[in-house]
């Protein structure tokens, strides 16, 4: 019998080169609240977090660049979604 997979452990081996000067994902100031709620549930890295006051906070550091939020939120919740500039972004390390 195999042991269950711990997603946090698997994500922990990835390396992230964060471009502090140029975020590759920008949330709209007037983002659709329902879409933000969907992104909280859909983001596999858990980067959209619901706060105690009901607002949603996002941090692009740690992004897996899967495109889930692009598909669900571009135009309604996201102002911009593009891949990080060269040498930046996620470096997958299978461990």
UniProtKB/Swiss-Prot annotation:
Q: Which InterPro entries match?
A: Fd_FixX
Q: Which UniProt keywords apply?
A: 4Fe-4S, Electron transport, Iron, Iron-sulfur, Metal-binding, Transport
**What molecular functions are annotated in GO for this chain?**
4 iron, 4 sulfur cluster binding; iron ion binding
Is Transport a UniProt keyword of this protein?
yes
User: Main role?
Assistant: Could be part of an electron transfer system required for anaerobic carnitine reduction. Could be a 3Fe-4S cluster-containing protein.
Q: Which family is this protein grouped under?
A: Belongs to the bacterial-type ferredoxin family. FixX subfamily.
Indicate what this protein is called per its UniProt record.
Ferredoxin-like protein FixX
């Amino acid at each position: 019998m195999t042991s269950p997979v711990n997603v946090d452990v698997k994500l922990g081996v990835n390396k992230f080169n964060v471009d502090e000067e140029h975020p590759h994902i920008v949330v709209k100031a007037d983002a659709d609240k329902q879409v933000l709620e969907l992104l909280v549930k859909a983001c596999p890295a858990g980067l959209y977090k619901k706060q105690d006051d009901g607002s949603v906070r996002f941090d692009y550091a740690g992004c897996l660049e899967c495109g889930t939020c692009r598909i669900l939120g571009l135009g309604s919740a996201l102002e911009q979604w593009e891949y990080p500039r060269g040498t930046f972004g996620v470096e997958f390390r299978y461990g």
